């Protein structure tokens, strides 16, 4: 409220979707908060020139974190959640930005991968996957093709829950 009273008209909110135990109700809470902020601005300033940006990344389970054993949501489920949130926030004063679900999936595969992925990475590089951290160069289909050619199932790295007693590829790192 103080920010609006002092002339601020733009707010950016950061969230993560796809966390373990997340429900659609949690996503609805994101929409509700964004709408409430816009309404609060109108109450305080009497104008409708507020801009709320909601930036939502996808959960990527990473080694050495409490969630390292948890699966990542499938690409289809992340895309469903993104669409659900978009449908809830249909307001010209609120903009939703999303991390690409397919990029997040590849991040999870590589983050929890083992030495076998070296074959995939080399093959992808040879096929031109060099600037894939840039959205305009990322080619998901080419990466999936490389996984298939190497006979490696990327879902085993990203979407599989891991047993806490399982030997992890990163366990040797101290």
Residue ranges and their predicted role:
Residues 18, 60-61, 65-68, 158, ...:
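Generic, ordered loop/turn and secondary-structure boundary motif
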Residues 22-23, 74-75, 171-174:
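General structural signal for secondary-structure boundaries
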Residues 68-74:
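Short glycine-enriched, charge-decorated loop/helix-capping segments at active-site entrances
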Residues 88-174:
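Radical SAM enzyme core and accessory elements
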